[in-house]
């Protein structure tokens, strides 16, 4: 069974107005209602966390990440494995 991953929008200047800061999504077995560009950018991190892995940041490892939308970084999202 896959672990749940919580995604939180921490900043938003989304050109399409899809997101606002504080929006939260729980990822289980289906992708959340994110635009495909943002989902494509974060999916590898989400997949690692869903499968119980940690992300390697060189000197540290963590069960969370922060990422920016590929559209000029207009949206910032934080993801973390739910315990």
For the regions a protein language model found, what residue spans apply to each?
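Short, compositionally biased
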Residues: 37-53
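Short, surface-exposed secondary-structure edge patches
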Residues: 13-18
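A short beta-strand micro-motif
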Residues: 5-11
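Short, compact, well-ordered microdomains
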Residues: 57-83
